[in-house]
Amino acid sequence: MASLFSGRILIRNNSDQDEVETEAELSRRLENRLVLLFFGAGACPQCQAFAPVLKDFFVRLTDEFYVLRAAQLALVYVSQDPTEEQQDLFLRDMPEKWLFLPFHDELRRDLGRQFSVRQLPAVVVLKPGGDVLTSDATEEIQRLGPACFANWQEAAELLDRSFLQPEDLDEPARRSITEPLRRRKYRVDRDVGRERGRNGRDSGDPQGDAGTRAELW
């Protein structure tokens, strides 16, 4: 997976905007993970509507407040913004664990062509080996939420034997005193999600008009 960004710099979306530039560091952050390539733009209303949905999706899978162990998931924002200021503004409220390409890196455009992205927003899901698992998961994320990951993981395991479980790589996660609270909150959130699924989308859904997307090319 790291080979996709070989020789490039990725930047962490934290306050210091730390650069991830060595091959070893890239491998540590991307290898043996499902990687989401999020194509979006701050000036795109559909992207603005979808961003909170994707943020919530990512946080619920990677934040230890919600899960005992972060999912094997990485996200790279591939900006289609016309200016660097718009890119920075769009990323300001997004998770610190997100990665993004420098604004002046032409790979931003090349990746759009490589993965045949025609409209925004778009989320390309890549297997650990770099092959495309889902060409655009935008609607799936909106419809299923974090449950998408289990489906992708199962498909990746069937199609790519290099996808290892976390216990094959790391020491068992230590349990904290907040574990019962996390478990209870997860159960409540899960039950609420199921209830909404039975009753239909509620009027407070943050998706907005994300069903209609902007043409890119």
UniProtKB/Swiss-Prot annotation:
Bias (Basic and acidic residues) ranges: 188-204
The keyword Zinc appears for this protein: no
Domain of life according to the entry: Eukaryota
The family database entries (Gene3D superfamilies) matched by this protein are listed as: Glutaredoxin (3.40.30.10)
Disulphide bridges, residue numbers: none
A GO BP annotation: photoreceptor cell maintenance
Q: Which UniProt keywords apply?
A: Cell projection
What region holds the Thioredoxin domain?
1-164
GO CC annotation: mitochondrion; photoreceptor outer segment
Q: Where is this region: Disordered?
A: 188-217
Query: What is the predominant subcellular site recorded for this chain?
Result: other
Output the Gene Ontology terms for molecular function. receptor ligand activity
List the SUPFAM superfamilies: Thioredoxin-like (SSF52833)
Write out the similarity annotation.
Belongs to the nucleoredoxin family.
**What does the annotation say about its assembly with partners?**
Interacts with isoform 1 of BSG.
Q: What is this protein called?
A: Nucleoredoxin-like protein 1
Gene that encodes the chain: Nxnl1
